[in-house]
Amino acid sequence: MAAKDVKFSGDARDRMLRGVDVLANAVKVTLGPKGRNVLIEKSFGAPRITKDGVTVAKEVELEDKFENMGAQMVREVASKTNDLAGDGTTTATVLAQAIVREGAKAVAAGMNPMDLKRGIEIAVAAVVKDIQKRAKPVASSAEIAQVGTISANGDAPIGKMIAQAMQKVGNEGVITVEENKSLETEVDIVEGMKFDRGYLSPYFVTNAEKMTVELDDAYILLHEKKLSGLQSMLPVLEAVVQSGKPLLIIAEDVEGEALATLVVNRLRGGLKVSAVKAPGFGDRRKAMLEDIAILTGGQLISEDLGIKLETVTLKMLGRAKKVVIDKENTTIVNGAGKKPEIEARVSQIKAQIEETSSDYDREKLQERLAKLAGGVAVIRVGGATEVEVKEKKDRVEDALNATRAAVQEGIVPGGGVALLRAKKAVGRISNDNPDVQAGINIVLKALEAPIRQIAENAGVEGSIVVGKILENKTETFGFDAQTEEYVDMLAKGIVDPAKVVRTALQDASSVASLLVTTEAMVAELPKADAPAMPAGGGMGGMGGMGF
């Protein structure tokens, strides 16, 4: 086991504080509408330019191991806030730095770190309660656009795009962000259910120009297993031919005689038919087939349910107004499923999302939910260069996360005003234990940190801004750093999601109070370099080899 280096009390805290400051100072320059960019070297390709706090935090690695530990703890704040709220990482970092700095001073002055921690927790609980009380529900599409715009650093088109996407796919819908090949940033909305399986044979194509299969008012046969023999399919095929409607077959696979017969029927014009493989794998495939069955008002043909293909009638088939299939995707639009059944399925999937502990499973369940409940929107981010596209994509993702958070818990005045106004709630708390009271006062002072930083990044003195806002008794009065004016933040549309503000403070105080109570730090001693190999002597006597 390698030897360790151990630092204690003041020495440990000083080193840790230096690390916290390096990381926080690199991150906090990005805060607010006039925040600057950070340029990050990449071992491959062009450097990356970003205004995203968590992206900067993840890149900071310090040489001194003790300083690095402090930096890593604050990086944890940014990552946790990003995971929970998806935005507010820079605010969380600024708050953590402020709490650690003040806490370290208090410990150096001889106060009890555990009492300080208790004071910090009491104050944070009061602030969270205050923020939740002030939060105003998001009602209109315009308010969603405002949240998106603020989070995308004042980029109004991005805010509008997110509002448009959320309006179309609903709050349950899935919105993904991708890079676009062109200069434009655009929204692509897929209505209905889309899954990533294309036609099994190009002979099914009905639109030769677009190479797609288009079926109007189609029947849909959903089968859990492979279809290879023809005999069992004949009764249902004959019934569909008599109805004169097209047919889509979704099964684990369609092969051999079954596929050949379908192709021949299609070419002869007897039956307008197409076949695709079922989406997903294993248990997930079965669940997705059941989703499609509910959406289209059909039944999944499964031997578990005792239904055989030979006994299938038209009533068991799903129906859809339109089905479009290309080489890679199938889209089912306007399925004939009953609304109460779809809603019951949606509730069931929501319950599974609550229960699952796996991020991957949660993501897949969320996708299934979106396909049933709303739809899928893709925001394609464009730009002149790869560096610009990546920077813009960071901002779009932040804005998207912020709008989702706003829909969940409502909005509060932005620009650090909500935290500053919460000072009143903390000011009412008093504690007989002077060290606990000192912990409460640490949070009281830290609540000013975000608004001071926003002002300083805009080139304005932070103390003056804080003083002016606190003088004014209007709760929503604040400082617009973009125009450098004092305005009503809600009226001007400068808002933050309550969830983002709350999460930023809770995560910052949680990690910062742990750092304040640190009394010793242990790190591995750097290994001494191994001595170099001696020069290759002793190879004499080779002179006669004629070289």
Curated annotation (Swiss-Prot):
Complexes and interactors: Forms a cylinder of 14 subunits composed of two heptameric rings stacked back-to-back. Interacts with the co-chaperonin GroES.
Major site of localization recorded for this protein: cytoplasm
Subcellular location: Cytoplasm
Catalyzed reaction equations: ATP + H2O + a folded polypeptide = ADP + phosphate + an unfolded polypeptide
Family of this protein: Belongs to the chaperonin (HSP60) family.
Gene Ontology terms describing biological process: protein refolding
Record keywords: ATP-binding, Chaperone, Cytoplasm, Isomerase, Nucleotide-binding
Reported function: Together with its co-chaperonin GroES, plays an essential role in assisting protein folding. The GroEL-GroES system forms a nano-cage that allows encapsulation of the non-native substrate proteins and provides a physical environment optimized to promote and accelerate protein folding.
Record protein name field: Chaperonin GroEL 1
Any one GO molecular-function label of the UniProt entry: ATP-dependent protein folding chaperone
GO CC annotations on file: cytoplasm
Binding site for ATP: 30-33, 51, 87-91, 415, 496
Top class in the EC scheme: isomerase
